[in-house]
Every structure is written in C-alpha cells, then in structure tokens.
Amino acid sequence: FFIKAGSAGVGANDKIGVGLIGCNGMGFEDLKAFLRNPEVECIALSDIDENVLNNRAAETEKITGKKVKHLYKDWRKLIDNKDIDLVIVGTPDHWHCLQMVSACQAGKDVYCEKPLGNSIEECNIMVRAAQKYNRVVQVGQWQRSDPHWQDAMQFVHSGQLGKIRTVRVFSYQGWCPSIPVKPDEAVPAGVDYDCLLYTSDAADELDGVD
C-alpha cells in the first residue's frame, strides 16, 4: 500500500534509478522484481558485508548486462547519490525507520520491506516523513496486491457470507530455521562493524519530522 503519493522526479525518457540498502535477503528479491521493468536501472548497492556486496553486484550484472555503478558499505552514501530516485530498504527491521526517513529527506521515494517499523511510534514517524517530504512510500505487503486476496475480501464485504461471528487466524512459524547464537569471535573479513553499530547521530536524522 502507498503511504503518500509524491511527484515523479524523472522525465518521460529517463530511467528510474534504484538503490538497494541491505542485499542479503528479501531486499535483493525486491530489486530483481524491479529490474524486470525495462525503465528501471540499478544505480547502487549497499551492504555492510563486502562479500555479500560483491556477490550481489555480480548477480545484478548477470541480470542486467551492466556493472553496478556504485557499491557502498555505508548506506548514507547511497542516500546522498543524486542519481538515485528510489531506495529499496531491505535491512533488518530495526533499521527501517532511520533509513526510510533519511531517504525521504533526501527527496527519494522508498520501497520498504515489512514490517514497516518496530513500534507504532516508529511507524508514525515514517508516515509523517512521507507526508512532510511528499514522497511515494510503499511497504512490501505483497498479499494486498494479489487478486485472490482482493477477491476474498470483496466477497466477505459483499455480505454473501451473512453475519460473520467467528474468525480463526493461524501463523505458521516453523518454515525458517532460527539464527544460532554464536560465541564471541573475530569480526568476519569484509564486515564493517562501524556501520553496523552506527547509532550516535541517529536522532539527528529524525530531527524535524513532526
């Protein structure tokens, strides 16, 4: 769903420049989906793990036939890139709010993986940012776009089921293995812990989003 519709920043003959933050999970799947549109170009990738970054850059080149122009460990450099129109936020959940707001402040539209934020407060901040900076922000709730879900909801709302008295909901939690807890060890080669632990000026990034 769209939080706020903003104005397009590219001309009729231009491609939409996309940058991905967080390349090792759903974010890259989102990027591949975007790249199916011939009017989209991947401008930059960002990940704190250099190994992941290089692997995804190679995969993207294989898909598009072009080298990715910019590779960043620090996601803030991707946000600052003037050639990027749209930012895909595919990082772990606790990063979504800061990165989405920063992208909006930089005048970029955003596709953010679910969940939107870690709290209602974060979500409210993100909605206000989309409104304040007049940006298009879509959350990866893909089920809302699938016709069979829309048809089912339309059928329920039509009243053909009569008065609904009971709703049962289940959540299948066992499909993904849990992340193992590992003992302290040396920083893996290629991982930038300084970016991973960046929090000191996070409040400044959200300043002014009333």
What are these regions (language model features)?
Residues 209-210:
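Hydrophobic alpha-helical segments, chiefly the membrane-spanning helices
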